[in-house]
Amino acid sequence: MKIKPTGDLALIKKINTAIVLEAVLKHAPLSRAQISELTGLNKATVSSLVQDLIDSHLVLENGPGQSSGGRKPVMLLFNGTAGYAVGIDLGVNYIRGMLVDMEGNVIAELQRGLKQNSEQQRGLDLQNAELQRGLNLQNAEQAIDQLTSCIELLIKEAPNSPYGIVGIGVGVPGIVDDNGTILFAPNLKWRQVELQKQLEERFGLPVTIDNEANAGAQGEQKYGAGRGIPNQIYVSVGIGIGTGIILNKELYKGTSGFSGELGHLSIEYDGKPCSCGNRGCWELYASENALLERASLLGYESLEELLEAAAEDDERVVALIRSIGDYLGAGIANIVNVFNPDVVIIGNRMSRAAQWLEPAVQAAVDQRTLPYHRERMRILFAELKDQSAVRGAAYYAISTFFSKIKSGQ
C-alpha cells in the first residue's frame, strides 16, 4: 500500500523541526546559515522551520552576529522563559522544591522539614501488618499534602509565559516503576504509593517521578560536575545512600528500571539489620544516618551541628566524619571496580562535609581499587551541593516537554 505523500511530508517536517530545535538548544547563539551547515538541511527549509519556532515562542532573534564580509547574520537563541518547570527532591526528612525556566535557571526555591509519623519515628515494632500498612499510608498522605503545598507555592511564583508550567519532576528515595508508582521506599517506609497519578490528577500537568539518585545524576550531568563526562556514577549520601549510573552519557536504569540501589550492597556479611530486609547494607555504615547515630554519643543531633564543630577543629567530630569517609570510600571502591567510570560524584547533604570526607574516601579508594581502574578515575563532590536532585527533577519535566514538542504533540 502506498503511503500518502502528505503524511510523509508532515512526518518529515516534524523530524526536521526537532533537528533544528536541537541545534538551537545545543549551539545557540547561531545563525540560520550555521544551522544549515550543522544539520545538512537546505537554507530555505531552515528559514521556514526557524520561523515556525519563532511563531511558537521557542526561538528568539537576538540581533546581528559577526561577519567576515557582507551582511551580518541574525543570531538565534532558545527562549528559556517560554515556560517553567517545578522540581522536587522528596527526602526522608525534608522537601526541597525549585522553580526553573526551560534553561534550568533558578527562579524560586524553598525547603521544608518533613515530619514522619510519630510512632514510626520512635521505631515502634508493629507486629500487625495491617496496622503497619495503615501507618505507612497515613505517613504518605501527610507527606503528599506537604508536597502538594510546596508545588502550589512554586507555581504561584512563575512569571507569565506562553507555555506556563510545562511539568513537574519529583525525585524520591526509593524504587519507582514506569507509571510513577513508588513500589518501595525503605527509609520512608512507603510501599505502592501512586505518586505520579495523584499529582497529575491534582495539577493537570505532566509529572515525572524517578529515584532521587537518578535525578541527582541527571542534575550533575546537565548543570554540575558531570557536564561533558561520558561515564559517571553519582553517589547520593543522605539519610540513606543511592546511586545514579550514567554510561556513555545515558542514564542506566536496568531491565526493570530499578538499578542503582547500591546503598543496599552488603559490606558486612552478618552486619546490622536494614529496613530493606537485608543485613550489613553499605548505607548503615556510610550515610548521614550512620554519622548521626554515632554522633549522638558525643551529644550532637544534626549534621549542621557536626559541620559547625568540625569547622571549629573539634578533633572528635573530625575523626568521626573521617571514619564515615572510610566506609564511604570502601563502597565507592566496589563501584569503581565494577563500572570503571571516569568520575564518581558524591552528592546530597553529606557533600557539605567534603573537606573532611575527601582524604578518607580517597585513601580507601586508592587502597581498595584495582590499579588500572583508578588510573584516570577522579572522585568529585557535587558542584550543585545538595541541590543536584531537585535540579535533575526539574530537568526531567523540561526534557519531557521537549520530547513532546519534537514529536509534534
Per-region residue spans from a language model:
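Phosphate-binding/catalytic loop of phosphoryl-transfer enzymes
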Residues: 88-90, 102, 166-284, 289-292, ...
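ATP-binding/phosphotransfer module of carbohydrate and carboxylate kinases, centering on a glycine-rich
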Residues: 1-123, 127-164, 203, 269-273, ...
